[in-house]
């Protein structure tokens, strides 16, 4: 479980698809800019993925699974989405997540960036001089279980 239920969702975006395999909610997704096309809600090319050093889209709020839907169904109570389906992305608000680089220990007030080494993770290490990878701000340090409160505010700084 990478995302706790204690969260505040001020703004979400439901215009993106996730097709990069399976994913656990709570990580930072980036735009799959190579495939983006159009601005309509059902543009199949508008995709997000767990990536490193990409343009942040927000925090993934669904579990992406790859199930045989002829034998079983998606668990609606877990917010499961089939691979290739639409996902909900948090663009403004705060969450408690453990999708944080294992090698860092963020402090309250540190800026949260997309990790340059671990796909889907957040870090407090700035990727060079650009602020375009900033997702928001850490509002706490990691607790005993590895979770930290992260305030998300996107779109962020434009470089």
Show the residue positions of the predicted features.
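Surface-exposed, low-hydrophobicity beta-strand/loop segments enriched in small/polar/acidic residues
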Residues: 1-159
